[in-house]
């Protein structure tokens, strides 16, 4: 096997001693008698072990919502999340940490953590990512629980020269009409509780659409987003150059669904649609997500029945899964509950 393994700094040749000979020469004498393949295997195993330890450290199995639900009262946990708020003195810090499920206050004390880690936590800005270990204790404060920090690490620090811009004052200005600021920082605005709440509600809406149709044995059917012609009228088409030809962004899944209907009979989709409409109102959108269905052998009454049934199912799902989120946005649950019963 010439040219595959190296001995010292040169390519191994057939005239070299057997692989069981000392690899680095007699002057080392440390690994004499070891096979090169064994050494390589050992190094690979060490690398995999180190990688496994890192991946295990980065994996997450403790969620703030479970802590707030009392599942870990009196237990030591390892919490992974992002700093949402931080205040305190030179001896104690009250750090609110968030994850995708909620917020919890973490109490960090200098005499427990030591100067190095305490000062690192103290100087960490909003949205720094942290791993905090400590004891979960029930309290009389807002969320009912807090974490007494005993150790941890700052995984990623925010650059002090570029702090997180979405502050409470910035949000107040945005509510007053400065929406361009939030649009310019959309990737960061997603981290705010308001946007997180809306995304969770959206996820439940999509899940309800899927569950409604699948429970009725509808087949989910996807269609291309590049099309050759109009579905809803040529004046709202987005034209796209397509390798020397003209193509358009789809306005609807309808034409493809009609072609597939004789094969599948009952089909649905959730997909984006694109229409070149000027944004005169919130109902004029250049891009939106579209839930559509197609049925063979159906009367007009049956189609309307599915329309009502879908709305009812979505409303019921939101009331069951996202009541807290809807209330936090100021939505009237009694109004939504009216649509959970049909006919309406």
Give residue ranges: language-model regions:
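Cysteine-centered motifs
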Residues: 45-47
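Intrinsically disordered, low-complexity segments enriched in serine/proline and basic residues
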Residues: 18-22, 26, 33
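Short hydrophobic alpha-helical segments enriched in small aliphatic residues
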Residues: 25-27, 36, 50
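Class II aminoacyl-tRNA synthetase catalytic cores and aaRS-like
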Residues: 52-344
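Short N-terminal alpha-helical targeting/association segments
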Residues: 4, 8, 27-29
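Exposed, low-complexity/repetitive linear segments and helix-based recognition motifs
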Residues: 13, 23-24, 96, 289
């Amino acid at each position: 096997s010439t040219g595959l393994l190296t001995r010292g700094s040169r390519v191994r040749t057939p005239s070299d001693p057997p692989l069981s000979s000392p690899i680095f020469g007699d002057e080392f004498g440390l690994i004499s008698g070891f096979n090169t393949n064994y050494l390589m295997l050992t190094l690979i195993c060490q690398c995999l072990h180190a990688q496994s330890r890192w991946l295990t450290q980065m994996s997450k199995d403790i969620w703030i919502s479970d802590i707030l639900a009392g599942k870990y009262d009196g237990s030591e946990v390892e919490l992974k999340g992002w700093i949402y708020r931080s205040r305190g003195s030179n001896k104690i810090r009250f750090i609110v940490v968030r994850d995708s499920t909620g917020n919890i206050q973490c109490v960090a004390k200098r005499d427990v953590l030591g100067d190095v880690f305490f000062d690192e936590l103290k100087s960490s800005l909003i949205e720094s990512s942290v791993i905090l270990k400590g004891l979960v204790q029930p309290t009389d404060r807002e969320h009912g629980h807090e974490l007494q920090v005993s150790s941890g690490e700052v995984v990623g620090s925010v650059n002090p020269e570029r702090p997180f811009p979405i502050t409470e004052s910035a949000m107040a200005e945005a509510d007053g009409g400065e929406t361009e600021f939030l649009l310019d920082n959309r990737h960061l605005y997603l981290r705010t509780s308001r946007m997180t709440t809306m995304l969770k509600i959206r996820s439940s809406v999509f899940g309800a659409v899927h569950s409604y149709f699948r429970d009725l044995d509808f087949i989910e059917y996807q269609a291309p987003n590049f099309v050759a012609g109009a579905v809803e009228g040529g004046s709202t088409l987005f034209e796209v150059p397509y390798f020397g030809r003209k193509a358009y962004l789809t306005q609807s899944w309808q034409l493809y669904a009609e072609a597939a209907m004789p094969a599948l009979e009952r089909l649905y989709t959730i997909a984006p649609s694109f229409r070149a409409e000027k944004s005169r109102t919130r109902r004029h959108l250049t891009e939106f997500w579209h839930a559509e269905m197609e049925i063979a052998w159906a009367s007009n009454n049956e189609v309307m029945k599915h329309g009502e049934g879908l709305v009812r199912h979505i409303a019921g799902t939101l009331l069951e899964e996202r009541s807290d989120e809807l209330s936090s946005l100021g939505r009237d649950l009694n109004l939504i509950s009216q649509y959970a019963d049909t006919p309406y």
